[in-house]
Amino acid sequence: MSQMLQGLRILVTQADVFMGPALCQTLAAHGAVVLADTQDLIPADAPQRMVEQHGHIDVLLVNLAMPAPSTHAGEVTEDEWQAVFDTMVHPLPRLVKAVLPQMQARASGKVLVMGSASALRGMKRASSYTAARGAQLAYVQAVGVELAPLNIQVNAIAQNFVDNPTYFPPEVQANPRFIERMKREVPLGRLVKASEDAEFAAYLCSSHADCFVGQVFPVSGGWATR
């Protein structure tokens, strides 16, 4: 295993869900000092407190997730909409705002958001979830070009059909209807392995990826290509 992340302090949010476990394992294998945090980020002051607790942060890896509601557009409640945005959207700018001063002072840093390809391709009964995921990606593109002159790279992985315990637990993967859907919709013909996704994330956290600015990279086995 390469040591391309040797000594880098990488903060991973919600490290116990979504891509958190695979990310922590892979980043550590590449030499990173992984700051695996599982704190609730919904309170408005939580992101600032988290960053202060961890001190020096070279890379902020924003891993935010919740079970995706499956609600007809005409039945989405105010509570559902608010909950999805409170969990997956509002913490993102707060985290960036909290970590930005130290990255600006060093003229160096990276932010990588683990997003969703659902924002790139329409999905039925997923309006609240895809709207939140789309907001994440729009934020990454805007902030990415703003911070690039400061040598701070902000990018996102937009994924779907990637093996993870939050969205594709074993019982889902074993469901015959899901297997047929995957064969029909995913050109790769299988789930992307968690390790494959995490290795790409590790690369984007490294100095080898300094040229990427406000980019959204689909990782979905071909389900979404742009």
PLM region descriptions:
Residues 121, 202, 213-226:
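Short C-terminal tail/terminal secondary-structure segment
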Residues 2-35:
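Canonical Rossmann dinucleotide-binding motif of NAD(H)/NADP(H)-dependent dehydrogenases/reductases
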Residues 149, 159-185:
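A glycine/serine/threonine-rich, flexible loop-to-helix segment
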Residues 71-73, 77-85, 178, 182:
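Substrate-binding pocket helix/loop in short-chain dehydrogenase/reductase
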Residues 186-197:
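A conserved structural motif in NAD(P)-dependent oxidoreductases
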Residues 101, 145-149, 210:
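Alpha-helical segment proximal to the catalytic Tyr-Lys
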Residues 110-135, 140-149, 161-162:
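Catalytic loop of short-chain dehydrogenase/reductase
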